[in-house]
A protein has these predicted regions:
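C-terminal engagement/docking regions of AAA+ P-loop ATPases
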Residues: 2-13, 17, 24, 69, ...
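Pre-Walker A (pre-P-loop) alpha-helix and adjacent loop at the N terminus of AAA/AAA+ ATPase modules
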Residues: 16-59
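Conserved alpha-helical scaffold flanking the Walker A/P-loop in AAA+ ATPase domains
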Residues: 43-46, 99-119, 148
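Loop/turn-to-beta-strand initiation segments
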Residues: 52-54, 78, 114-118, 132, ...
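P-loop (Walker A) phosphate-binding loop of NTP-binding proteins
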Residues: 59, 93, 161
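Canonical AAA+ ATPase core
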Residues: 100-105, 126, 138-220, 225-235, ...
């Protein structure tokens, strides 16, 4: 029997509360391998609970790959890495039909997409045709090969990394694919203090390929994720908060710097992410501050600027800052 406890003034099942505590502890567990980047870790946890996908942008060498590997280890989930290159083919992602000479039959050989956490490394280094191979998997959680749909494991989350677009040899992601990422997270270069900590770890024997030796152990798993997802669905959304989300997204469409603003799908993503953040924070209701906290990661990749605005130095985050400062906040 599942009992209930009082947390922050409301009743939750002890199972859901244990799941929340485990997911909060996940940040510290990942921190055994990754120095800093707390916001990125939190964003990945939010995406897992929302069944959403994440795009991470950062220059090479800021631990994007290590972050995903550490998260998978701390959740006891399967993970596969695909290095996207200019010659990567769609079948290299989804799998293909092969001929078995022993049985004289054709069979399906699964591609690396059949996993829990798929790390699509440097996704913008491969042409759009191969980038789009992930589209069905991200939206439908299945892939179709030779006309037959094949279901992907649950949970299934794509965590794609990309270099900044000004880097040579990169291909901009198609708008349809960008819109299917729940969040876009940025991983900046570390501070001096963090960089000293990174070098100290390596000087004392840290091996990024051996996370167990670094002390990273599973603190949560599929059961905790399922309990947490169920609990998130009970978090209350006041009409005023929903209206605030809509007003923020509509305001992006009227900005003079924007060619294409946030769609209703983007508004839904912001609402869902804010709801999850509220639950992780120990509340059973969403506040406008929750919406503000998630607005940039949930919307920055859905704001397409006019060319002249980009030349003048405008940025999606700058547009969102203006929107957040001007749209009235419900009381």
């Amino acid at each position: 029997m599942t009992s209930t406890v009082r947390i922050g003034g409301f009743s939750v099942s002890d199972e859901a509360e244990r799941a929340r505590e485990a997911l909060v502890a996940l940040r510290a567990e990942v921190g055994k391998a990754v120095v800093g980047h707390d916001a990125a870790v939190t964003g990945l946890i939010v995406a897992l609970l929302c069944r959403g996908h994440v795009l991470i942008e950062g220059v090479p060498g800021v631990a994007k790959t290590l972050l995903v590997r550490a998260l998978a280890a701390a959740l006891d989930l399967g993970t596969t890495r695909i290095q996207f290159t200019p010659d990567l083919m769609p079948g290299d992602v989804t799998g293909s039909i092969v001929y078995d000479t022993h049985s004289a039959e054709f069979s399906f050989r699964q591609g690396p997409v059949f996993t829990n956490l798929l790390l699509a490394d440097e996704i913008n280094r491969t042409p759009p045709k191969t980038q789009s191979a992930l589209l069905e998997a991200m939206e439908e959680r299945q892939v179709s090969v030779d006309g037959r749909p094949r279901a992907l494991p649950d949970p299934f989350v794509v965590i794609a990394t990309q270099n900044p677009v000004e880097y040579e040899g990169t291909y901009p992601l198609p708008e349809a694919q960008l819109d299917r990422f729940l969040l876009k997270l940025t991983m900046p270069l570390p501070s001096r203090e963090e960089e000293v900590g990174i070098l100290h770890r390596h000087a004392t024997g840290f091996d990024p390929m051996n996370l167990a030796a670094a002390g990273v152990t599973p603190v949560a798993g599929p059961a905790e994720l399922a309990a947490a997802r169920a609990a998130v669905r009970t978090v209350a959304l006041a009409p005023e908060v929903i209206g605030y989300v809509v007003d923020l997204c509509r305001a992006t469409r009227h900005s003079p710097a924007v060619r294409l603003g946030v769609s209703p799908r983007g508004a839904t993503a912001l609402m869902t992410a804010a709801r999850t953040w509220a639950w992780l924070s120990g509340r059973d209701y969403v506040t406008p501050d929750d919406v503000k906290t998630l607005a940039r990661p949930a919307l920055r990749h859905r704001v397409e600027l006019r060319a002249e605005a980009e030349l003048e130095g405008a940025s999606p985050d700058g547009v969102l800052d203006t929107v957040l400062a001007t749209v009235p906040v419900p009381r």
